[in-house]
């Protein structure tokens, strides 16, 4: 600090600190849809197709009208291990928590895509309750931590 006359000046330069969003924000997100989810244990298929396959078709129809967020993708999978609570979808992205929703119906297709947008924009996969579409609230059944960027402790 310098003193000039009666004024005291701080000569230390103040660098502006920019807060950068973590690299996980806006990372490509993938929506996984379980094709093998059944309608019920009593009625596993309708017209030789499972409920998961119908949900996948409904989601694809919505995507034709409104594309996925940039670099995001859709992947049909054989099983998401939520067989007691069909239909199931999951969301994954680098550096973000993985999320699985269960008890979904064909009517949830648009809400699944709305949530994908919120998940894509989230910092670490924690989407505020207010941003979760009404039809998905209370249906989050699995939350897994993001995988480590690199292994710190390796098994020997």
What are these regions (language model features)?
Residues 22-32, 60-82:
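Immediate flanking context of iron-sulfur cluster ligation sites
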Residues 84-85, 91-96, 119-156:
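Short flanking/linker segments adjacent to small metal-binding domains or redox-active Cys/His motifs
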Residues 94-104:
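Short Cys/His-based metal-binding microdomains
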